[in-house]
Amino acid sequence: ARRERARLRLGDGESGDLMALLDREGLKVYRPQFPEGTPLEGIFLFDAEAGPILVVDGRLTPLEADFVFARLYAHYLVDNDPYVIHLLVRGAEASAQDLRAQSFAAAFLVPAEGLAAYFEALKWVPGTALDAPTALQLAAYFEVGYRTLLARLLTLNLVQPDEIPPLLIVLEAGGEPDAGGRERNAISERFLRLALEAHARKFLDDRALA
């Protein structure tokens, strides 16, 4: 995750809109609304003509979608097998590949170096109980959901498992962190621009554009 962040020149702070980032990398990314009530959150597959495709449920909040996109990106980087389709299903037992993807996603979205710098600025000492206001600041700074943040802190031994449930109750009672202007677009801005340009040049009619 650290090497990939360095390659993308993301620094030690927030990663920004993952859908837009992966789109700039040339990946096919989509956020259609999945059927209501489905536990399916994301799909990674490889198409012979289109290449790697990452699909995330458009019903997820933007920050939840970022975490799913990051997990799918991990499968793209490590498990890019044209004969395997990866389904991210909420509540399903995680395979070794899924656990690795979750760890990558948390590390990619919340870099250890950025955390260390932030804690140093706060003069927070590891081993001290993390309070809700500090967790709220961290989630806002890295632009991640509370569960993503706490999962990352847990892997770095900065919080203990028994600290997480009461923190989540307080944090989630106040609503999701700010999404940094992310929108719930079903297709990427790049594909939208291409479609509009094709329509303007008469390569697509009104029905095809719709």
What are these regions (language model features)?
Residues 1-210:
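Active-site hotspot residues in diverse enzymes, especially metal/ion-binding acidic/histidine motifs
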